[in-house]
Amino acid sequence: MSQQNILAASVSALSLDESTVHTGGASSKKSRRPHRAYHNFSSGTVPTLGNSPYTTPQLNQQDGFQQPQAFTPKQFGGFNNGSGSVMSTPVMVSQERFGASEASSPYGQSMLDMTAPQPTSHIVPTQRFEDQAQYLQRSFETCRDSVPPLPTTQFYCVDQGSCDPHLMSLSMYNIPESEHLRAATKLPLGLTIQPFSTLTPNDAEVPTIPLPMDGTPLRCRRCRAYANPKFQFTYDSSVICNICRVKMQVPGEHFAPMGPNGQRSDLNEKSELLHGTVDFLVPSIYNAIQEKELLPLHYVFLIDVSLLANENGSSLAMVEGVRSCIEYISDFQPNCEVAIIVYDNKLRFFNLRPDLDNAQEYIVSELDDVFLPFYNGLFVKPGNSMKIINDTLIKISGYISTDKYSHVPQVCYGSALQAAKLALDTVTGGQGGKIICSLNSLPTIGNGNLSLKRDNAHIAHVKCDNGFYKKLASDFLKSYISLDLYVTNAGFIDMATVGHPVEMTSGILKYYPHFQQETDAFTLVNDMVTNVSNIVGYQALLKVRCSTGLSVEQYYCDSSDNTDHDPIIPVLTRDTTLDVLLKYDSKIKTGTDVHFQTALLYTDIDGVRKVRSINTSGAVSNNIREIFKFINQNPVMRIMIKDVIKTLGDCDFVKIRRLIDDKMVEILTQYRGLVSSNSSTQLILPDSIKTLPAYMLAFEKSELMKPNAQSTRGNERIYDLLKYDSLNSAQLCYKLYPQIVPFHVLLEETDLTFYDANDKLLQINSSSINNLSVRASHSNFINGGCYLIFQGDTIYLWFNENTNRMLLQDLLSVDESLPVSQISLFSGTLPETGTSINQKASNVIKNWQQVVNKSSLPLVLLRPNVDQYYSNVMSQLLCEDKTVNRIESYDNYLVIMHKKIQEKLQKDDFIKVSTAATHENIHQKFVQF
């Protein structure tokens, strides 16, 4: 049989067969495993276990929970159902109102019954459209729905006492009762936490709980969990903690009498007992530095004005970015203070005191032992000193543009960072702040200078091995300082070393190779303003608490060294995302609920100390079929990728790819052997993780994982590595598998238009999904087509010389006679032409901006035989194609996996489930915040 026939036979039968549950034979041997909720790729095999009966648990009812009022998104056309309630489901702007009989309460179904996710396609773009379609006419209700929508799906959420999954989500919503059962899935048990994710609608605010009379929130005296909707209050003035199940007396200041319905009489006044996510105001005992008064966030802007930065225009772009950021801070963060320092082979400080007539510059040439030439006027509130700030920026621009004979090629990057830290420590008393820095070339002078070298592949690993930058990063962390770095040159700068403080302090690194002022300046300025606008707080400490039986194995965070130590996050943004791996301490009782609480202690940008409490739960199960059914793919994928990244070692990427493939085969073999054993001739993908192979294959083809025989620490590889620490879930999904939307196909009138009045839900008719679902493969591109392609931070517009010129005229407002090679975009944005196709394209771009939480996204032309970067970009975008280093195409990858799965099944080489094996009980450790 030909390869094509094999491929067709193997791939065409993709399905999810849940009609039969396999019950394998008993194991002949049992052995103890470490209490770990997920095995590294280097771990050994897991012991084979026997059979177990299957039951389907339901979430248990918690006393003291009151249903919240029905939810209507802002501007939605909700209607009265005759009893005063309002539909919680979004109503399309143009649709007719339903009849009264259809307006029943959205809570008619018991909140205890978890709703299984609907089956979707195994093709990534199709799955995204299908998933979005499911949430056009309904909201996600946190006590009824279980597995959340895809990260790329926009949806409205009703907080019914469990958090919005944007903020925290589980990898499994039916949690295995034991480590043995979890091991049988070969999947990680963990959490993905994005504490300040943008909620829908945008004005959905997290409630703030004021300080009670005694000055402390209600907390469990044993495990220190914060009060939440699953706290059980009793008639004897006690409360039972849902985390550790300990009963304690309710303090007098938190007491309220119980009503006949078993609920507190003041329940409607207690947001912390109604909502899954709240902010507690906390007293000074919670301060990062007890004896210090809290301060608003302080910014230091560091501008590289060396010769190369001035020649390519990146220094001028940085000056404009600083101006835009300070204007934003003045308008939206008025209590924050800013400082400006520029550097080349010297440090230049600027006095920004509002009572000055002109900008004052102080030059420091002592780089080995940096000092501050002045104190008063180093930091100012922008609103008070905007005149002097503008004068300072004009003076810097004049130096860059006209004083060219004074420009030098050296940069004292390390000394500049030390100066910024010294400034923050001196003014804030060690309370931290944000450093925003540009860098254009390898640091060669001052502290932290690096010898001129090239990436010669002699160093196999990708970790920082420079003592100065490792110590500097550690010092930043202790002082709650975070660094954002903007690199504006393609030359080798040892990014693994100079970017280490960024990685350690949860900062952001942006890379603009071959920087050109005409095309990249706009993007740089927008990136800077977006990153500043995303900042929500600083001085953060995070802790996850779990019900007895589970605990944290590790936080995937460099500040905690990827251990179970509570991670420090110097500066928080809306995109700050943390993945957590859990472990079993003991077996958990089937039919009960497991509760999870993330407590994030932080100071907001205005200097107010708070704790954000985020709560969710899952049901305990011993049914392997139900466990697979309620898998949440996004945390699974993120944890698998983080586990690879944190164990790169000597970067043998061939071996690492093989281990990833083996892990995928093991997962699918377990599903096939335990759940869908009857479909012997079919390739079976569990519906809950149907696209996981596509994403993991795309990860194998990423810039990070490319062959390293010639280059191990190049800028592109390290930049790709650092991205995985800073991307939120939606950005990561688009980065791994770009979304491609064709505009040359026939579209319905309502296709690619917004369904709701808030312009959040992009709709596509079911009849158009196939036409609009373009797989990331060269064979799916049509000569003469026109496509928008999005890969997380950049949108590409693909067309060629055969594209319909009338289409381009309607889309871009370009003359039909203008050659394709001469078409350009002003400031990297889509022009407004007033045509239907232009409006649809604008809607798509707006939707992507909302999903990834960006105020703007650059639009870049991508034309074959025109743009020099075309081949390189296309090789990154087309993740389903076979690569030059012989990583298989997606279809062939599935065929190869199918063969390996069949071989393992024939050998009976998979773990069989059993409830006979037990672990000794290890009580959850006492945790203190």
Curated annotation (Swiss-Prot):
Task: List where in the cell it is found.
Answer: Cytoplasm; Golgi apparatus membrane; Endoplasmic reticulum membrane
Pfam families to which the protein is assigned, alphabetical: Gelsolin, Sec23_BS, Sec23_helical, Sec23_trunk, zf-Sec23_Sec24
Give the start-end ranges of region Zinc finger-like. Answer: 220-244
Q: What processes in GO biological process is this protein linked to?
A: COPII-coated vesicle cargo loading; intracellular protein transport
Q: Which InterPro entries match?
A: ADF-H/Gelsolin-like_dom_sf, Gelsolin-like_dom, Gelsolin-like_dom_sf, Sec23/24_helical_dom, Sec23/24_helical_dom_sf, Sec23/24_trunk_dom, Sec23_24_beta_S, SEC23_SEC24_subfamily
GO MF terms, alphabetically ordered: signal sequence binding; SNARE binding; zinc ion binding
Q: Which UniProt keywords apply?
A: Cytoplasm, Endoplasmic reticulum, ER-Golgi transport, Golgi apparatus, Membrane, Phosphoprotein, Protein transport, Transport
The reply on keyword Membrane is: yes
Q: From start to end residue, where is composition biased (Basic residues)?
A: 29-38
Q: Does the keyword Amino-acid biosynthesis apply?
A: no
Which family would the database say this protein is a member of? Belongs to the SEC23/SEC24 family. SEC24 subfamily.
Primary role:
Component of the COPII coat, that covers ER-derived vesicles involved in transport from the endoplasmic reticulum to the Golgi apparatus. COPII acts in the cytoplasm to promote the transport of secretory, plasma membrane, and vacuolar proteins from the endoplasmic reticulum to the Golgi complex.
**How does the annotation summarize its subunit structure?**
COPII is composed of at least five proteins: the SEC23/24 complex, the SEC13/31 complex and SAR1. Binds to SED5. Interacts with GHR1.
Q: Please tell me what else the database record remarks about this protein.
A: Present with 12200 molecules/cell in log phase SD medium.
For this entry, the protein name equals: SED5-binding protein 3
Q: Which organism is it from?
A: Saccharomyces cerevisiae (strain ATCC 204508 / S288c)
